[in-house]
Amino acid sequence: VYVSFYDALRFSNWLNNGEGSGDTETGAYTLLGGTATPSNGPTVARNGGANTFLTSENEWYKAAYYSPGGVYFDYPMGTDSVTGCVAPGSDTGNSANCNLAVYALTDAGAYGLSASPYGTFDQGGNVWEWNEQIVGGGNRGRRGGSWGYDVGKLAASSPNFYSPTG
């Protein structure tokens, strides 16, 4: 899908501002400069009062790996067992689109038996998901692995980062 971190922020702003003709440069985040890479890009952070935004690293991690029963799991399907990289029709309840199992993106929710303990879908595999974490000064956090990466990238122990212009 090749969505940059800044594209994701602009989409969040658009949603935050009610869609339609809503502004993409202010809202949940203030993006300065009017260019694809904002002049404040390395330091842009969530504005107070935002109602639609990217998650922080901690918010993403909890939604994917935490059980309301007080346990953290290794994989975002509510299990410590290694996730199976399979096509959606072979979903066993611990499955994802990873390791070239499908060789393409799948629809959101295609692995209907493989929700996290909070009921979220697709936090493992399919596409990398940006979060707000700043890593190494100029990169931003991302989680979840993708359809082209091995199952290890889905694990709680595998945080990742990438250039925000990605």
Predicted segments with their positions:
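Functional-site microenvironments in short loops/helix caps that host divalent-cation chemistry
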Residues: 5-155
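Extracytoplasmic Gram-positive cell-surface binding/anchoring modules and repeats
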Residues: 1-2
